[in-house]
């Protein structure tokens, strides 16, 4: 259920999140000049655009067209309370039992998750989280239509013909990227940060 780990092994959505929809856009914010991003952009410039969230103009965003795998649970299959109960279960059955016995401060990791909340669910969700407040540590709440309210949302459900046409265009023009051909011509390592974050601690805020 760990977010990055689940993606690495091929799970379509991170952690304990259901698929956003049967068809959706997934967006990733990236830094301009990053070698991996620039290599990707050479092959798929049509998937890249300026980020509207970076005031310095140094970030871009990549939009990936995604179709959920057959039989996937999507966000509309779960109520907000059902999703919250999954988070609670993982916290109790996975995070807490996996805490190292050497931890003397009673500090644990947590299950981070974004819960999609319909208009009629808000009061119940607030009461539920307060009742179980010692269980939740990193839960975000998003309005059901939040993916349409916020520009370049990380996940956006495809709901219109124009959006589906964009999905098809992104997919049809996608070019496979062979990352084995990527190599750095300049070392961009920030040595101060590398030293500061060595030996199991990090001084960089």
Feature map (PLM): residue ranges:
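Catalytic alpha/beta core of large soluble enzyme barrels
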Residues: 1, 8-193
């Amino acid at each position: 259920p760990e977010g990055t780990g689940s993606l690495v092994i091929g799970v379509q959505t991170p952690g304990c999140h259901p698929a956003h929809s049967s068809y959706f856009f997934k967006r990733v914010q990236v830094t301009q000049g990053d070698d991996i991003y620039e290599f990707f952009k050479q092959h798929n410039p049509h998937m890249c655009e300026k980020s509207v969230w970076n005031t310095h103009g140094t970030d871009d965003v990549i939009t990936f067209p995604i179709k959920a795998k057959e039989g996937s649970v999507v966000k509309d299959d779960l109520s907000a309370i059902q999703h919250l109960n999954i988070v609670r279960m993982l916290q109790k059955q996975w995070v807490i039992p996996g805490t190292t016995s050497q931890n003397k401060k009673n500090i644990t990791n947590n299950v981070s998750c974004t819960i999609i909340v319909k208009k009629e669910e808000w009061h119940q969700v607030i009461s539920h989280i307060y009742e179980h407040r010692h269980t939740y540590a990193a839960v975000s709440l998003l309005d059901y239509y939040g993916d349409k309210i916020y520009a370049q949302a990380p996940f956006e459900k495809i709901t219109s013909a124009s959006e589906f046409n964009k999905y098809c265009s992104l997919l049809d023009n996608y070019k496979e990227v062979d990352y084995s051909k990527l190599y750095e011509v300049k070392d961009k390592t920030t040595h101060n940060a590398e030293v500061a974050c060595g030996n199991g601690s990090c001084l960089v805020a």
